[in-house]
Amino acid sequence: MIYNEYSNNIAKRIGHYTQLPDGWAVAPMQMLCSLIDGEKQNGIERINLDVKYLRGERDAKTLTSGKYVAANSLLILVNGENSGEVFRTPIDGYQGSTFKLLSINYDMNTEYVLQVINLHRTILRENKVGSAIPHLNKKLFKAIEVPIPPYKEQQRIVEAANKVFMSLDVIMGSL
């Protein structure tokens, strides 16, 4: 369960279903994915996949050692104001120091898990830990209770959510 600063069960307060459809389960996020580091490498020149580069705010800088991350990997920001933000790496490179590699279990739809993480971004952002530099509250992240439908239903949910987001983009563009 996820609790807010008043020790109220947030899931209960926002009305999450207590009865799930047949074939569904609930599991904490830590059962669905893990936050790890890339494999350490030395002597190979690669791009530093830091947050400014991944946002397109800075040109690539190269390093000759670091924690290797393959192209199309998922990096989650664990330090700073936007902790919980997830990036997909465009190329092979070295993991930026403010990131962890987000490793999602093979039996979960990656986009479904990313939708769940995105759903909880505000809670994660508002409940950071650390005084000098805010950090992702990993305990809170790992404890997020995730409703898990069968895989095909995960795909259907992602497709439906994407259609809604596309419609919202059209509406926002016309305002």
Locate the predicted segments by residue.
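ATP/adenylate-binding site constellation spanning eukaryotic-like Ser/Thr protein kinases
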Residues: 80, 138-141, 162
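A short beta-sheet element
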Residues: 52-59, 65-118
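Basic, amphipathic alpha-helical recognition segments used for DNA target recognition
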Residues: 28-34, 39, 87-92, 100-148
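Short, solvent-exposed loop/turn positions at domain surfaces
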Residues: 20, 62-63, 130
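Non-catalytic DNA-recognition/assembly elements of restriction-modification systems
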Residues: 4, 8-39, 50-54, 147-175
